Design a protein with these regions (language model features):
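Multi-pass alpha-helical transmembrane bundles in non-GPCR membrane proteins
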Residues: 2-170
Length: 170
């Protein structure tokens, strides 16, 4: 015990906490060349889109690390759980952002991006303020967001190389 902190009582899920911390660190590391390359392009849409994507990725892993690490009080656990689940919406929308702005662009890209972020914001509001929100509601929203790309699948396939499309599916 150090200063009243005992591992038995304070660490909630060390396995998940460690793997998500590793994910956060790796996301930060791989984001560096991505952001540098976007700045070198001089394309502000590319820069902003990739910053949004990397922040959403690091944010999700950071929130998840915090949620799975700390077992301080039921109130804090509940807040961290809400943040962790809300960040899933942010990551999905953040992942769409470069595809919609860089790959698609135009009315289709920005229209799809608007729909995705509206659903993400609604999902965040549900997670944060609708205390009794059934799990199926957020699950349906996650799945709907994931499948919305179908409306633009032909232009996405046409615009990406086979390798890039493979990475998108991964």
């Amino acid at each position: 015990m150090i200063g009243g902190f005992t591992m038995k009582h304070k660490l909630k899920d060390p396995g998940s906490a460690i793997t998500h911390l590793i994910g956060m660190i790796l996301a930060a590391i791989v984001s560096i060349p991505l952001i540098i390359k976007s700045f070198l392009s001089g394309d502000y849409v590319r820069i902003i889109s990739l910053i949004i994507f990397t922040i959403s990725m690091i944010g999700l892993y950071g929130a998840s690390t915090a949620y799975h690490s700390f077992n301080i009080s039921p109130m804090i656990n509940k807040k961290l759980k809400k943040l962790d689940h809300a960040m899933i919406f942010v990551l999905i929308a953040g992942s769409y952002t470069p595809i919609c702005t860089i790959v698609l662009g135009g009315t289709l890209g920005y229209g799809l991006l608007s729909v995705i972020w509206i659903i993400a914001i609604l999902g965040i509001v549900f997670k944060m303020f609708w205390v009794t929100c059934p799990k199926w509601v957020s699950s349906v929203m996650y799945i709907a967001m994931g499948w919305l790309c179908i409306v633009a699948i032909a232009p996405i396939i046409h615009s990406l190389s086979k390798t890039s499309f493979g990475w998108l599916l991964a």
